[in-house]
Curated annotation (Swiss-Prot):
<comment type="function">
    <text>Usually encoded in the trnK tRNA gene intron. Probably assists in splicing its own and other chloroplast group II introns.</text>
</comment>
<dbReference type="GO" id="GO:0009507">
    <property type="term" value="C:chloroplast"/>
</dbReference>
<dbReference type="GO" id="GO:0008380">
    <property type="term" value="P:RNA splicing"/>
</dbReference>
<comment type="similarity">
    <text>Belongs to the intron maturase 2 family. MatK subfamily.</text>
</comment>
<dbReference type="GO" id="GO:0008033">
    <property type="term" value="P:tRNA processing"/>
</dbReference>
<keyword id="KW-0694">RNA-binding</keyword>
<protein>
    <recommendedName>
        <fullName>Maturase K</fullName>
    </recommendedName>
</protein>
<dbReference type="GO" id="GO:0003723">
    <property type="term" value="F:RNA binding"/>
</dbReference>
<keyword id="KW-0934">Plastid</keyword>
<keyword id="KW-0507">mRNA processing</keyword>
<dbReference type="Pfam" id="PF01824">
    <property type="entry name" value="MatK_N"/>
</dbReference>
<dbReference type="Pfam" id="PF01348">
    <property type="entry name" value="Intron_maturas2"/>
</dbReference>
<dbReference type="InterPro" id="IPR024942">
    <property type="entry name" value="Maturase_MatK_N"/>
</dbReference>
<dbReference type="InterPro" id="IPR002866">
    <property type="entry name" value="Maturase_MatK"/>
</dbReference>
<dbReference type="InterPro" id="IPR024937">
    <property type="entry name" value="Domain_X"/>
</dbReference>
<dbReference type="GO" id="GO:0006397">
    <property type="term" value="P:mRNA processing"/>
</dbReference>
<keyword id="KW-0819">tRNA processing</keyword>
Length: 513
């Protein structure tokens, strides 16, 4: 406990106050582009309808508000309140997006400063490979072979927006900033008097991705902090989706309060966290909790997580959101892969003097494959094929040049191969490649009002090279001296790339579902 209190005091010394007036000054653009915070990369804000807004637009909008005397909450002049004027949907949607996303930039500044001020964080850039999404799978392969049971956890959304604000109060002591945050959240919840809480959350998630991502990560970190803080030494992975928000200031205070309010429940369940064979992995709203214990222990874990979230975090977790499975008898979907731990049987021939023996050996193997049906469904939603996987043309791209069309299709194919390079079965990837290649040919044929055969003959090897993936280049060098080697389904080698820090747009819907 003394160690935790010392840790808490250390975190308090790093706490930063918000510079609230910065949101309403034109210097926010330069401040958000500070090299010490974000490096040399420009800050991009993704709005709804796949529109991109940079912080430069935030700067221009704030200047325009000064010039035209715009006010966020005008009482005397309600006609000038274009942010809350629901009759003008364009102003209401556009201004709320720009201001809320700009506010999200300012909201992230104290957390970025706290991360940079930590002495031990200076060593992290040397281990940037651990931030890769693919670094999770070698960890699972190393640990899951020795485990028995797996729990799938779906982290629920908060019941009310006020819970999000209260969670941030542990780190944010600037009252005006919290009031401004409440204004944005109430704006979405009061858009329609008949709208439900879940629809309000969906609207916030769709139109203000940066602000929602920050709030949701803060919310999820509260859900998992008690578990991750005590079990942090069991894994060296730093998930970028929640790594910034793992530390809490009032952890020791909340643990003391929890021990006073529920002393018996707290003491009985605390020893579960010290199990060295308990492993936890999360990305976005889905988490995996695996252990070597018995089924009874896993059921106790499930009961504990439900009660812990209800009494300690003030929100209700439905028991069906936590599913228990045995690792060897089930598969699980995580990060766009379908993973399983099957038991393979091998016959080993042993010889002792003149006698031969056949020994049946059973061995576990961590297997990852690319799910065919969900990926084809994702291509179907993107209008590259039908629901059954038949390639179709992309009419919206017919206005582009031929090389732009080839480049887009080839880039999508390479991204899919790059992300799913860890799949042990390549048949699904080559099926996706066939769909994209034929869809590209049909798009070009539709543009020039010709046939697919004509374009395939005219482009020849150039058309095939655009879809020649990096993985095939690697294997062609490895097996250059092999005469009977074929790419299509003849190898099961898996490659994990440690430079993947984000998920492809075609794969991301598989993770959210």
């Amino acid at each position: 406990m003394e160690k935790l209190e010392g840790y808490s005091e250390k975190q308090k010394s790093r706490q930063q106050y918000f510079v609230y007036p910065l949101l309403f000054q034109e210097y926010i653009y330069a401040f958000a582009h500070d090299y010490g915070l974000k490096g040399s990369e420009p800050v991009e804000i993704f709005g709804c309808n796949n529109k991109k807004f940079s912080s430069l637009l935030v700067k221009r909008l704030i200047i325009r508000m000064y010039q035209q005397n715009f006010r966020i909450n005008s009482v005397n002049h309600p006609n000038q309140d274009r942010l809350l004027d629901h009759s003008n949907h364009f102003y209401s949607e556009f201004y709320s997006q720009i201001l809320s996303e700009g506010f999200a930039i300012v909201l992230e500044i104290p957390f970025s400063l706290g991360e940079l001020s930590c002495p031990e964080e200076k060593e992290i850039p040397k281990f940037q490979n651990l931030q890769s999404i693919h670094s999770i799978f070698p960890f699972l392969e190393d640990k899951f072979l020795h485990l028995h049971y797996l729990s799938h956890i779906e982290i629920p959304y908060p019941i009310h927006f006020e819970i999000l604000v209260q969670l941030l109060e542990y780190r944010i002591q600037d009252v005006p900033s919290l009031h401004l945050l409440r204004f944005f959240l109430n704006y979405y919840s009061n858009w329609n008097s008949l709208i439900t809480s879940m629809k309000s959350i969906f609207l916030l998630k769709k139109e203000n991705k940066r602000l929602f991502r920050f709030l949701y990560n803060s919310y999820v970190s509260e859900y998992e902090f008690f578990l991750l803080f005590l079990r942090k030494q069991s894994s060296c992975l730093r998930l970028i989706s929640s790594g910034t928000f793992l530390e809490r200031i009032h952890f020791s205070m909340k643990m003391e309060h929890f021990g006073v309010m529920y002393p018996g429940f707290f003491r009985k369940t605390l020893w579960f966290f010290m199990d060295p064979l308990m492993h936890y992995v999360r990305y976005q709203g889905k988490a995996i909790l695996a252990s070597k214990g018995t089924l009874l222990l896993k059921k106790k874990w499930k009961s504990y997580l439900v009660n812990f979230s209800q009494y300690f975090l003030s929100f209700w977790t439905q028991p069906q959101r936590i599913r228990l499975n045995q690792l060897t008898n089930s598969c699980f979907d995580f990060l766009g892969y379908r993973s399983s731990v099957p038991i393979n049987t091998f016959l080993v021939r042993n010889q002792m003097l003149e006698n031969f023996f056949l020994i049946d050996t059973r061995m576990k193997k961590f297997d990852t494959t690319a799910p065919a049906t969900p990926l084809i469904g994702s291509l179907s939603k993107a209008q590259f094929c039908t629901g059954l996987g038949h390639p179709i043309s992309k009419p919206i791209w017919t206005d582009l040049s031929d090389w732009d069309i080839l480049d887009r299709f080839g880039r999508i194919c390479r991204n899919l191969f790059h992300y799913h390079s860890g799949s042990s079965k390549k048949q699904t990837l080559y099926q996706l490649k066939y769909i994209l290649r034929l869809s590209c040919a049909r798009t070009l044929a539709r543009k020039h009002k010709s046939t697919v055969r004509t374009f395939m003959q005219r482009l020849g090897s150039v058309f095939l090279e655009e879809f020649f993936t990096e993985e095939e280049q690697v294997f062609s060098l490895m097996f250059a001296k092999t005469t009977h080697f074929s790419f299509h389904g003849s190898h099961s080698e898996r490659i994990w790339y440690l430079d993947i820090i984000r998920i492809d747009d075609l794969v991301n819907p598989l993770i959210l579902n």
